[in-house]
């Protein structure tokens, strides 16, 4: 998330009126962004604010842990697909520990054992496999993506244990649990969303450039080698850097 914020804060609108090579569908993407932002401001944000205000922090952490644990098979799957065999076994053990000792993931009992949380997904896997980024996309009601990352949305969904909850639980249970997961996710984004609103000259570009930089950061596990940036996305990000730093200091 720090990469998202630092990238977005440094973004200004390009003065060149030509089509952006990383975002050739910008006109359509902006419409999707505006629609999603409207829904967020009028529906999700007020609910998330109430959640943050009235739900105690320890309970929020446990709820977040629970949903992270439900989604963790996706991390394990992509560990192995990327050839990170040791990390895959460590994450498998983390999942087992938190599911059992951690009471279904409500408590992160694995971290004190040295089994730290990782962030892997199918979009990163495709990047590791050498698939080009492709054009930027903004998926309505979901958020920023790229042609390469888009298939990962489906993989993340079907590898989430909540996807299969309907097989052994009624809709009266699955529905509220799903809604709570959406609220939890939005609540975790409240801080970055406020920074976006306060610091970004163009919120759309803030989200886009921050997302692209964050994805590059994740694919290279936080250490991207400059000589490896032959992806058009890197050229675009380089062109998007501001000419000077803000005189008031860096915004984070």
Give names to the regions the model predicted.
Residues 1-2:
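Sec-dependent N-terminal signal peptides
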Residues 8-9:
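N-terminal Sec signal peptide cleavage junction
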Residues 13-15, 40-41:
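Short, solvent-exposed loop/turn elements at domain surfaces
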Residues 16-19, 129-252:
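A structured, mid-to-C-terminal "fold-capping" secondary-structure block
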Residues 24-54:
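Post-signal-peptide N-terminal segment of Sec-exported extracytoplasmic proteins
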Residues 61:
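A small/polar active-site loop signature that marks catalytic segments
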Residues 64-66:
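Beta-rich strand-turn-strand
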Residues 69-147:
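Mid-length scaffold segments of soluble, non-membrane domains
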């Amino acid at each position: 998330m720090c990469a998202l914020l630092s990238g977005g804060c440094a973004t200004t609108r390009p003065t060149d009126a030509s089509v952006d090579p990383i975002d050739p569908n910008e006109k359509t993407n902006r419409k999707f962004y505006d629609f999603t932002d409207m829904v967020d401001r009028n529906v999700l944000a007020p609910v998330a604010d109430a959640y943050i205000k009235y739900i105690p922090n320890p309970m929020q952490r446990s709820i977040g842990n629970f949903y992270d644990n439900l989604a963790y098979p996706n991390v394990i799957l992509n560990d192995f697909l990327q050839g990170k065999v040791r990390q895959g076994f460590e994450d498998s053990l983390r999942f087992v520990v938190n599911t059992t000792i951690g009471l279904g993931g409500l408590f992160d009992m694995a971290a004190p054992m040295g089994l730290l949380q990782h962030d892997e997904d199918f979009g990163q896997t495709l990047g590791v496999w050498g698939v080009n980024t492709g054009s930027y996309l903004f998926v309505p009601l979901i958020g920023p993506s790229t042609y390469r990352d888009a298939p990962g949305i489906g993989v993340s969904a079907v590898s989430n244990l909540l996807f299969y909850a309907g097989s052994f639980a009624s809709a009266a249970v699955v529905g509220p649990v799903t809604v709570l997961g959406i609220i939890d996710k939005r609540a975790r984004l409240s801080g970055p969303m406020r920074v976006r609103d306060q610091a970004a000259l163009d919120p759309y570009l803030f989200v886009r450039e921050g997302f692209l930089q964050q994805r590059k950061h994740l694919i290279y596990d936080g250490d991207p080698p400059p000589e490896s940036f032959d992806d058009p996305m890197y050229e675009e990000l380089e062109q998007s850097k501001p000419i000077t730093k803000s005189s008031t200091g860096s915004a984070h």
